[in-house]
Amino acid sequence: MCDVEGAQINIGKNTRIHGTCIHAFKRIDIGQDCLIAANCQIFDSNGHNSLPNERRTNNGEAKEIKIGDNVWIGANSIILPGVSIGSNSIIAAGSVVNKSVPSEHIAGGNPAKLIKRIDE
């Protein structure tokens, strides 16, 4: 769902998304051949300003999200604003990703941490 005029969500070929909430205030790019499991949430903004008087009138700062090709995001994961997930990476189920993940890595946890390179 694009929450403001001009926001973009781009989803590549052969990407499968199951029961996931995607909110774009700016831009979210999801590559080709990705698997995004059920109950994931992908937000490029916190959805509101932290100042009490501006919560209903100001969406806060949006930061683009980029998910590369052939990424697998496990169920119940949350991808936060400004994150990039490199191609061929895996995000473990239930992770909260608040920092970028390089290509060909497995990350998991809350907050998500790099676990290992996929080829190790």
Spans of features found by a protein language model:
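Flexible, glycine/small-residue-enriched loop-and-beta-strand segment within the central core
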Residues: 1-79, 83, 117-119
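Active-site-proximal glycine-rich helix-loop-beta segment
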Residues: 38, 93-94
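Extended beta-solenoid/beta-helix repeat architectures
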Residues: 84-86, 101
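Short helix N-cap motif at coil->helix boundaries in the Bergerat
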Residues: 99, 116
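Multi-pass alpha-helical transporter architecture, strongest
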Residues: 112-114
